[in-house]
Each structure stands twice: as C-alpha cells, then as structure tokens.
C-alpha cells in the first residue's frame, strides 16, 4: 500500500519526502515503547504491550523506509553510479551504527558489580530506549530535510494519480510476473532468512560461547574498516564483473569464514575466553565478515534500481516504491521466519537452560557446542540457497544499457510530442 501510494503521489514534496517526514516521529516513539515497557504491567499485559510496540514500530518503519529506499533508486540512472550512491549511504549507516554501538556499550551497558556483562542489566534499557528513540527520529528528519533539494530533479507521475486497491494489485502482479525481479527477490528472501537465523545467535554466541563483555563488544566497531573496504570493492568490481557474480562470490566467502570461525575454537587454535588476544582475533574476523557482507548490501539495492528500468519497459510506469515495498515486506516476513527457526533451535536442539541470561548460571559444554554448530555451520551452509538462485540470474550490464537507451528515446519522443 505504501509503495504504490508513494509511486503515484504528486505533492509539493515529490513522491517520497512527504511520507519520510510523516514516519519520523512515530518511529522514534515506537522504538522507545519497545525498550521501555511500564514496570507495573502483568505478564499478559506485557505481551500486549510488546505486540503493540512491535507492530507500531513495523508500521512506522514502513512509512519511512519504503519511500527512502525508492528515493535512493531514483537518484541516478547510471549503472555504476547507482552502486556508488548505495555505497555512500551504507558508509553513513555503518559510521552511525558503529558510533552508536560504541557509545551504548561504553556509557549505557558498561559493566557493574552485579552485571559484569552490562548488556544483561535490565536497568540499563530505559535509558537506552530514550536515547534510541530520540536519535532515530532526529536522523529520519535530517535524512528527509537534507535531501529535499533533489525533489525538483526526480520523476513525477505524468498521468492523474488515481489510487486504489485494484491499482496496487495490478502493480504487484506486474512485478511478480517479471522473471528477473522474481529471481532477485526470492534470493533476497532466503538471504534474509539465513541472516536473521544467524543473527539470532550472534549476541548469544558473543555472550556465552566467546564470553565477551560489553567493553569487549564495543571494539567490534573497528569493523567499520571492513564496511568501507567492502563497499569500495563492490563499486569497483561492478565496473568489470556482473553484480550477481560479485554477490555469489561474497556469499561463498562469508560461508567459509563463518565455518572457520567456530572451527578455530573446536581445534583450540584461538586464545582462551578472557584472554585479551581473543577479542582482537574476533575483531579481525568481524572485519573480514563485514567486508563480504557489505558487498551484497551495496549491490542488491543497485540491482533493484536496474530492475526499475526494466519494469518501466513492461508497465510504462516508474515503480521504485512498489519494488522496494515488496522486498521490504518480504524481508520483514522472512526475517521473522529466521527468528522463529532460531528460537526453535535454541529450545529443541541446543537446549539453552532457562535463566541463562542471569549472571552466574552455568551452561554445559555440549550446549555451547550445539550453539556453535547452529551458528557457525548450519546457518552459514544455508547460504547455498540464495547462491544457487542467483546463479540463474542472467540480466547483464549490457542489457541494462540497452533498456536505458530505449527509455531515453521514449521519453525524448514523448516530450517532443
């Protein structure tokens, strides 16, 4: 709904910025609610509060994120420059994320006498909620405000902007019958499942398998170096190789790195937990991991922008909002599947004991072994699925150039008429 509405919106703020402004404040409020439930709630009321907060957060995020993603697709029609724009956006995101994580682990989740691993201290989360809510709203407003000068240069609907559910479904089905879009989206779906499945275990692994504290985890911010290098490599390599081939190579390397990481512990080839050297071994591994993760993060959105040109030749409309919205909705849905699978694994395969989050609760070695197998072996091997799908994706750089030439000729002809 938001994607189709955004594609057909014709306001003084263009097609995207009005919704970006509208989503900023609710997003910060819902973020605060999620991490700061009232203390007087009963268990059943707490479940209701969390449900309301999560659903509200998802809705507010959709209102902001869908036009924001579409806006990024619109900024350039150049095949290579699209990757550069996405790359710079990711660099800004990584810098902000690293600064945020370092600040939180240093000043909010610092160790205390009762909680040597500060991220397990429940008293830290109200302050975290306030800071996060304010920052999210502020950055959303800034993002919209500082890019408003681009509005006059963006495409607008050339026909009356009739909007209905029928219009939405027509655009939806038009995209689903695009074979290139279908393959790309399905590969992203499975990658989202794998990423959320593996991400579910990251905090658990860092806390219980590797024994890291909040002070240790803040040094993982060094991974920003890997993000910068990965984005640079993605942009440079896309000039010489097909984007899908670069993603396949990056995902394959990522799979190997994850397996090697836990294998080093199995063979006792890394320092023991608590040794300061272990932190830096893991930081180096994280830098390598972020290099290969940031490459698909750069190239997937760039490929979606390329597909918006292909889709225009089929439907006659610019559908960046719908393209991004379908992907965003599916990513939310599939990431939830990954979290559910992770929870089931944690309960029925790993056997994590109840109350493990409380400091001092012992965890048996076989539980930690199954945890490592789930995170390092099972989750990483699932990357074979998106790799296999992307191997069948055949749209090339030359194909995109030809499509863009056709669109330029069509727009020039229509303008003369």
Regions found by a protein language model. Give the residues of each.
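Membrane-embedded alpha-helical bundles of multi-pass transporters/translocases
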Residues: 1-417
């Amino acid at each position: 709904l938001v994607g189709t509405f955004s594609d057909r919106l014709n306001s003084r703020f263009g097609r995207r910025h009005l919704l970006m402004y509208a989503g900023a404040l609710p997003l910060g409020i819902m973020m605060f609610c999620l991490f700061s439930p009232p203390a007087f709630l009963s268990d059943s009321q707490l479940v209701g509060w969390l449900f309301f907060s999560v659903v509200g957060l998802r809705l507010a995020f959709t209102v902001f994120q869908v036009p924001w993603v579409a806006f990024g697709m619109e900024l350039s029609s150049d095949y290579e420059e699209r990757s550069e724009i996405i790359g710079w956006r990711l660099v800004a995101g990584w810098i902000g994320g690293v600064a945020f994580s370092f600040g939180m682990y240093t000043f909010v989740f610092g160790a205390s006498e009762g909680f040597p691993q500060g991220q397990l201290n429940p008293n830290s989360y109200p302050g975290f909620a306030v800071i996060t809510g304010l920052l999210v709203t502020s950055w959303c407003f800034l993002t919209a405000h500082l890019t408003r000068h681009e509005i006059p240069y963006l495409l607008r609907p050339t026909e009356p902007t009739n909007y209905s559910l029928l219009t939405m479904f027509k655009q939806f089905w038009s995209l689903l019958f695009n074979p290139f879009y279908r393959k790309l989206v399905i590969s992203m779906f499975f990658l989202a499942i794998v990423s959320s499945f593996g991400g579910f275990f990251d905090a658990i692994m860092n806390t219980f398998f590797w024994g890291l504290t909040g002070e240790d985890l803040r040094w993982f911010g060094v991974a920003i170096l890997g993000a910068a290098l990965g984005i640079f490599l993605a942009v440079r390599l896309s000039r010489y190789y097909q984007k899908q081939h670069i993603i396949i190579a990056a995902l394959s390397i990522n799979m190997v790195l994850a397996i090697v990481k836990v294998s080093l512990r199995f063979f006792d080839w890394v320092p023991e937990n608590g040794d300061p050297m272990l932190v830096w071994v893991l930081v180096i591994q994280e830098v390598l991991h972020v290099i290969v993760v940031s490459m698909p993060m750069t190239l997937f959105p760039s490929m979606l922008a390329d597909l918006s040109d292909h889709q225009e030749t089929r439907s006659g409309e610019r559908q960046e909002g719908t393209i991004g919205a379908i992907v965003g909705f599916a990513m939310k849905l599939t990431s939830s599947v990954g979290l559910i699978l992770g929870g089931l694994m944690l309960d029925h395969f790993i056997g994590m004991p109840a109350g493990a989050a409380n400091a001092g609760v012992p965890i048996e070695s076989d539980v930690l072994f199954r945890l490592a197998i789930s995170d390092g072996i099972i989750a990483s091997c699932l990357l074979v699925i998106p790799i296999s799908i992307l191997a069948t994706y055949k749209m090339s750089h030359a194909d995109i150039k030809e499509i863009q030439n056709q669109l330029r000729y069509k727009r020039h002809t229509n303008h003369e008429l």
